[in-house]
């Protein structure tokens, strides 16, 4: 489990260290940096998948993703006597991300991403470069707890005899996670990489008239709902057959008293139907309101038979009627019994 998240110089976040529990809610007004927290978590997951540099470039490169304010605030700026304005930079340009483990057997990780030195002979002179990486055990990075150290192209691994240098250099555009996750020499790196790859993110479920979740879908065992909810019907049926079918029925009834869901199977196609009190026939997914469909998608995501180590939800309350929020909260709390959960949420009003 993670005990803390650290972000420095990312978009609207100058420096943030946030404690994490089994269930953590990140909330605040618009512009307070909630979305930056979510996107920073996505970048950390991209490191384990080898895509962090590409993701940063898609966001506009370091020039667009770095802290948008001045390097330092003068006393006059803090008092409001003068407007906030840029100052002469005295520190290296660096985006820093990391997290700490909760227990001694958990691993922590940190990365420092900066600008490349002037290299006139390459067309990739604007690509961000990974400057430093570190892995340690437990909640604090100390010389006694550090297990892996990467500085520039040089990688060192710690074993029972001390620090051992790895002969092969690490490219500046690649993480040590993907370049040297050796089960013999660096088992902690391999373990941490697979943990980070298992992190699961849900950001936005489509609920428009053409949303994939409204259409009949190919049916196959689906223990993990797709990010866009394409396989809703198959995911719900998988929960019923190999997951907690009673929890599924209870979650539907908690939000819609007297209602139930059914998965209609027509050949290789699955379709979601919802029975509601007072109606003579079930409603298909195409007929459901946006809020009802989104709630069913959250049920499928949160009651997964294959819970991840970390589940990150971005504004799950979007498009839900206020009456559904208590049931959603209970559903999220139930998911937190199986996974560590981080919820990014906008406060009501």
Language model features with spans:
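Electropositive, glycine-dotted interaction segments
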Residues: 94-242, 246
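Conserved P-loop NTP-binding catalytic core
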Residues: 39-118
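Short, solvent-exposed secondary-structure boundary motifs
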Residues: 7-8, 101-103, 249-255
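Conserved N-terminal strand/loop that marks the beginning of ABC ATPase nucleotide-binding domains
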Residues: 1-9, 93-97, 200
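Switch/communication elements of ASCE P-loop NTPase nucleotide-binding domains
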Residues: 1-50, 258-261, 266-349
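Extended helical coiled-coil dimerization/tether regions that scaffold
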Residues: 220-285
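Active-site phosphate/pyrophosphate- and oxyanion-stabilizing loops and adjacent acidic/basic residues
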Residues: 190, 250, 330
């Amino acid at each position: 489990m993670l005990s803390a998240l650290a972000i420095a110089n990312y978009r609207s976040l100058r420096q943030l260290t946030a404690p994490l529990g089994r269930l953590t809610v990140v909330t605040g007004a618009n512009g307070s940096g909630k979305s930056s927290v979510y996107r920073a978590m996505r970048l950390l997951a991209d490191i384990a998948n080898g895509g962090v540099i590409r993701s940063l470039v898609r966001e506009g490169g370091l020039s667009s993703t770095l802290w948008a304010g001045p390097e330092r605030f003068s006393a006059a700026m803090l008092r409001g006597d003068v407007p906030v304005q840029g100052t002469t930079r005295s520190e290296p340009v660096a985006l820093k991300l990391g997290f700490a483990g909760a227990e001694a057997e958990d691993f922590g990780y940190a990365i420092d991403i900066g600008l490349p030195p002037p290299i006139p002979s390459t067309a990739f002179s604007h690509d961000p470069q990974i400057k430093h990486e570190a892995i340690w055990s437990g909640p604090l990075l100390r010389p006694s707890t550090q297990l892996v150290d990467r500085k520039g192209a040089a990688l060192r691994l710690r074993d029972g005899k001390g620090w051992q240098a790895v002969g092969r250099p690490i490219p500046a555009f690649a993480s040590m996670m993907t370049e040297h996750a050796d089960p013999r020499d660096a088992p902690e790196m391999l373990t941490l990489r697979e943990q980070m790859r298992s992190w699961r993110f849900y950001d936005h479920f489509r609920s428009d008239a053409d949303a994939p979740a409204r259409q009949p879908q190919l049916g196959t065992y689906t223990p993990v709902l797709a990010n866009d909810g394409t396989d809703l019907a198959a995911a719900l049926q998988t929960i019923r057959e190999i997951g907690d079918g009673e929890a599924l029925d209870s979650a539907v009834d908690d939000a819609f008293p007297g209602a139930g869901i059914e998965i209609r199977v027509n050949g290789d196609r699955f379709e979601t139907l919802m029975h509601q009190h007072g109606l003579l026939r079930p409603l298909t997914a195409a007929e459901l309101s946006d809020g009802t469909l989104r709630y069913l998608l959250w049920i499928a995501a949160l009651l997964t038979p294959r819970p991840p180590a970390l589940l990150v939800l971005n504004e799950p309350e979007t498009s839900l009627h206020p009456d559904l929020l208590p049931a959603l909260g209970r559903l999220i709390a139930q998911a937190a019994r199986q996974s560590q959960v981080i919820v990014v949420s906008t406060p009501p009003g």
